[in-house]
Design a protein with these regions (language model features):
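ATP-binding N-terminal substructure of ATP-dependent carboxylate-amine bond-forming enzymes
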Residues: 1-53, 58, 91-95
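Short acidic active-site motifs
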Residues: 8-9, 107, 140
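Structural motif
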Residues: 21-22, 120, 155
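A conserved helix-loop-beta module that forms one wall/lid of the active-site cleft
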Residues: 43-131
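Conserved residues at the C-terminal ends of beta-strands
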Residues: 24, 85, 182
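Glycine-rich phosphate-binding loop signature in dinucleotide/nucleotide-binding domains
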Residues: 13-18, 113-115, 149-150
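ATP-dependent carboxylate/phosphate-activation module, predominantly the ATP-grasp catalytic core
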Residues: 139, 158-203
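Alpha-helix N-cap recognition
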Residues: 103-104, 135-140
Length: 203
């Protein structure tokens, strides 16, 4: 977030002649894209022959986009039921006079009706829990989607009830370690606050 390009930052680091560079990314608002920047810096350092420990850009971009993260999670864990809503398609009939019936909108509402409530409605790109709303009924979600408040691509997901835990996986090139559980603190709405988590686990 310094305003320096990845190339200039990598050059500054390279001048220190490190044996290895380890990326440590902190959160940023409103967009938590620091990991993307550190991944770009790592690529530049690797071009200069400096070893790095950092996520690659593909993983960093996938983690930045909440829907891409959701798809990634679904490949190896049971994730909450959810749907991605493409803003332009959802409003297709308003911008295209030739569209008399918006089948995409019909599909979106059909899927939301199948969900268990409450659900969370969130922007696909915001940092942490910024902008996340809890909605308790189908009618509440329908009203939101048909209002002017719906102004970007969003996700609607079932809210998993109960205390929230997570973990971190550290490693490189196939050698990974799963760290002890993390107990997430939550906002008054019951949404995870990843910047205020407490780590603990078995001895």
């Amino acid at each position: 977030e310094s305003g320096m390009s990845a190339e200039d930052t990598a050059e500054l680091i390279a001048q220190q002649r490190p044996d290895i560079a380890v990326a440590i990314a902190s959160g940023a608002v409103p967009f938590d894209w620091v990991p993307i920047k550190t991944a770009l810096i790592a690529e530049e350092l690797q071009k200069r022959g400096i070893a790095t420990i950092a996520n690659n850009t593909l993983v960093s971009v996938a983690a930045f986009d909440k829907w891409r993260s959701n798809i990634m999670f679904r490949s190896f864990v049971k994730a909450a039921k959810g749907i991605y809503i493409h803003h332009e398609l959802f409003l297709a009939e308003k911008k295209n006079p030739g569209v008399s019936v918006n089948v995409y909108k019909e599909y979106v509402f059909y899927r939301i009706k199948e969900m268990n409530f409450p659900v969370i409605v969130k922007d696909t790109l915001g940092a942490g829990s910024i902008g996340v709303e809890v909605m308790n009924s189908y009618e509440e979600v329908e009203s939101f989607l048909n209002s002017d408040r719906n102004n970007s691509d969003i996700m609607v997901e079932e809210l998993i009830q109960g205390e929230q835990f997570g973990t971190e996986i550290h490693g490189v090139e196939g050698r990974y370690s799963v760290l002890p559980p993390i107990a997430f603190s939550v906002t008054k709405e019951g949404i995870t606050d990843p910047l205020s988590s407490v780590k603990f686990g078995p001895e």
